[in-house]
């Protein structure tokens, strides 16, 4: 099996930096690029075995276009470490990459991975998803250690959807906790949110079982139960009376659930999907309803059987 020796990471935020730390600890040469880097994008990528995309969803297409314009060949394996959905066409990060790099193997890295905990050396697990078994195995080997357990699967779509959608739910749970609604309400919210995630997965054709793995339920639980989650913090701060702008300034980092909630609301409206939690989050973020009204609306919905 091919062994990765050089990795190029695009993105120098908390997540990209944590991934760099994991790879360096495994002996790989790591180059890291951002828009403020002195090293050029071409020099960062040249002869690297892994190209790791760790920029925000909003910046992914632009960076991918810059890479494509360099015409550096198709030898490297892409690793998508971005979570979110593009607002045009509801494309996942790996699909955006595949559109531009059809000949390169593309993998997805996702799971319950709070960057601060991993950077502190606390144990964690993740998933490398790809339809290319060899590429997945190479990336798995590059990241795996006694503190970071890495699994593989063959459902990149479901893996990415789980990672993107849980951010929206984390905002909702943050609101719930910020309003001090208790453990019962939080548990009900997370459980019904999983039903919404499964509906979206079914719509896009993802495998149901993926959402009960690390990149689905695992990521959902981590993001919805930890104050380290940026999306959870956004919801919590909104419930405390802060504006969205103030909440985002306070966390000083990208909260992908904000844009993903709006994308999901559009999807639900256009395709007739029942996504009441995501819809309420989108309205709350756009300041069309208050946190209290959002909870009241969910509780007042028509009674029904418990069906996914």
From Swiss-Prot:
Q: What is the lineage of its organism?
A: Bacteria, Bacillati, Cyanobacteriota, Cyanophyceae, Synechococcales
Q: Which pathway, metabolic or otherwise, does it act in?
A: Membrane lipid metabolism; glycerophospholipid metabolism
Under which main EC class is this enzyme filed?
oxidoreductase
Lipid metabolism keyword on record: yes
Instruction: List, in alphabetical order, the GO biological process terms annotated in this UniProt record.
Output: carbohydrate metabolic process; glycerol-3-phosphate biosynthetic process; glycerol-3-phosphate catabolic process; glycerophospholipid metabolic process; phospholipid biosynthetic process
Q: What is the active site of this protein?
A: 166 (proton acceptor)
Question: Which positions bind sn-glycerol 3-phosphate?
Answer: 83, 111, 166, 219, 229-231
The subcellular location is: Cytoplasm
> Where are the disulfide bridges?
none
Chain sites annotated for binding NADPH: 15, 35-36, 83, 115, 230, 256
Q: Which domain of life is it from?
A: Bacteria
Entries under HAMAP family matching the protein: NAD_Glyc3P_dehydrog
Which controlled-vocabulary keywords does the entry list?
Cytoplasm, Lipid biosynthesis, Lipid metabolism, NAD, NADP, Nucleotide-binding, Oxidoreductase, Phospholipid biosynthesis, Phospholipid metabolism
Q: What reaction is this protein's catalytic activity?
A: sn-glycerol 3-phosphate + NAD(+) = dihydroxyacetone phosphate + NADH + H(+); sn-glycerol 3-phosphate + NADP(+) = dihydroxyacetone phosphate + NADPH + H(+)
The EC number on file is 1.1.1.94
Function (record text): Catalyzes the reduction of the glycolytic intermediate dihydroxyacetone phosphate (DHAP) to sn-glycerol 3-phosphate (G3P), the key precursor for phospholipid synthesis.
Kindly provide the name given to this protein in its UniProt entry: Glycerol-3-phosphate dehydrogenase [NAD(P)+]
The entry assigns this protein to a family as follows: Belongs to the NAD-dependent glycerol-3-phosphate dehydrogenase family.
Task: Give the InterPro entries listed for this entry.
Answer: 6-PGluconate_DH-like_C_sf (IPR008927), 6PGD_dom2 (IPR013328), G3P_DH_NAD-dep (IPR006168), G3P_DH_NAD-dep_C (IPR006109), G3P_DH_NAD-dep_N (IPR011128), NAD(P)-bd_dom_sf (IPR036291)
Gene name of the encoded protein: gpsA
């Amino acid at each position: 099996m091919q062994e990765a020796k050089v990795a190029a990471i695009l993105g120098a935020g908390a997540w990209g930096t944590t991934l760099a730390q994991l790879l360096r600890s495994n002996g790989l040469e790591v180059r890291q690029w951002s828009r403020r880097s002195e090293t050029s994008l071409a020099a960062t990528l040249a002869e690297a075995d892994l190209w790791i995309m760790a920029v925000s969803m909003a910046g992914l297409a632009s960076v991918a276009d810059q890479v494509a314009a360099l015409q550096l060949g198709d030898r490297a394996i892409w690793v998508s470490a971005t979570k979110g959905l593009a607002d045009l066409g509801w494309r996942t990060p790996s699909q955006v990459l595949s559109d531009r790099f059809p000949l390169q193997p593309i993998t997805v890295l996702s799971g319950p991975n709070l960057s601060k905990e991993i950077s502190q050396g606390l144990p964690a697990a993740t998933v490398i998803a790809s339809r290319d078994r060899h590429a997945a195995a190479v990336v798995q080997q590059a990241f795996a250690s006694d503190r970071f357990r890495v699994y593989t699967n063959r459902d990149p779509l479901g893996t990415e959807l789980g990672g993107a959608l849980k951010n929206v739910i984390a905002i909702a749970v943050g609101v719930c906790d910020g309003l001090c609604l208790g453990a019962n309400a939080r548990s009900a919210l997370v459980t019904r949110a999983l039903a919404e995630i499964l509906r979206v997965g079914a719509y896009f054709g993802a495998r149901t079982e993926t959402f009960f793995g690390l990149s689905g339920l695992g990521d959902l639980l981590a993001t919805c139960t930890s104050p380290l989650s940026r999306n959870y913090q956004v919801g919590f701060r909104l419930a405390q009376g802060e504006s969205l702008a103030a909440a985002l300034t306070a966390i000083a980092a990208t909260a992908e659930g904000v844009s993903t909630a709006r994308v999901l609301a559009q999807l639900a409206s256009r395709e007739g999907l029942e996504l009441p939690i995501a819809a309420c989050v989108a309205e709350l973020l756009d300041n069309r309803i208050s946190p209290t009204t959002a909870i009241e609306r969910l509780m007042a919905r028509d009674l029904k059987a418990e069906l996914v």
